[in-house]
Curated annotation (Swiss-Prot):
This is Signal peptidase complex catalytic subunit SEC11. GO terms for molecular function: serine-type endopeptidase activity. GO terms for cellular component: signal peptidase complex. Coiled coil: none annotated. Its EC number is 3.4.21.89. The active site is at residues 55, 95, 136. The keyword Transmembrane applies. Component of the signal peptidase complex (SPC) composed of a catalytic subunit SEC11 and three accessory subunits SPC1, SPC2 and SPC3. The complex induces a local thinning of the ER membrane which is used to measure the length of the signal peptide (SP) h-region of protein substrates. This ensures the selectivity of the complex towards h-regions shorter than 18-20 amino acids. SPC associates with the translocon complex. Belongs to the peptidase S26B family. Residues 42-193 are lumenal. GO terms for biological process: signal peptide processing. The keyword NADP does not apply. PANTHER family: SIGNAL PEPTIDASE COMPLEX CATALYTIC SUBUNIT SEC11.
Length: 193
């Protein structure tokens, strides 16, 4: 089945193999640069995330691909769908803002006014999954009742349904991920262009 490919692989010189490996590395590096560039444009460490659970049904289903932004200086409102990571949490969580609260440590006086102007960083959020019966305080770190702005990864701006199932499959079955990477690497090495 792969006899022709193996013969072609043996006929290639070391110089050609190194060139193909360099081309493969440049494709990987280009992908990483695009990911980081998208992160800079959207002001978030993860501009694209996959929904991993059914906690946001019927708004989003497991496997939906979400596009995020996190503009600084913009306040969150009740009903906004956010993605957040709690301290010592590995997986970002996609849930809706249930309630907002203001704190005043960074507040400044507005001239000729008796009230304070709050910055978006002074905002605290309480979230809940649409399909969950209670709010997320049980998911937060112990002693944490509200999310701070530093915990927010981004606000959902759009989605593509079910495209993220490929990512879920590769995480659930690591052999699939390594097999696909191996096939891609082999194809890059034996490609004759």
């Amino acid at each position: 089945m792969f006899s022709e490919e193996l013969k072609a692989f043996r006929r290639l010189g070391i110089r050609h193999l190194l060139l193909q490996a360099l081309n493969f590395a440049s494709v990987i590096a280009s992908g990483l640069m695009m990911w980081k560039g998208l992160g800079v444009i959207t002001n978030t460490e993860s501009p694209i995330v996959v929904v991993l659970s059914g906690s946001m049904e019927p708004a989003f289903y497991r496997g939906d691909l979400l596009f995020l932004t996190n503009p600084s200086g913009v306040r969150f409102h009740t009903g906004d769908i956010t993605v957040y990571k709690v301290p010592n949490g590995d997986i970002p969580i996609v849930h809706r803002v249930l309630e907002t609260h203001e704190i005043a440590p960074n507040a400044t006086f507005v001239p000729h006014k008796y009230n304070r102007a709050y910055t978006p960083e002074d905002q605290l959020l309480l979230t809940k999954g649409d399909n969950n019966p209670i709010d997320d305080t049980g998911l937060y770190t112990q002693g944490m009742d509200w999310l701070e702005r530093k915990h927010i990864v981004g606000k959902v701006r759009g989605f593509v349904p079910y495209v993220g199932y490929a990512t879920i499959a590769m995480n659930d079955f690591p052999q699939l991920k390594y097999g696909l990477l191996g096939i891609l690497g082999l194809m890059a090495l034996i490609q004759r262009e």
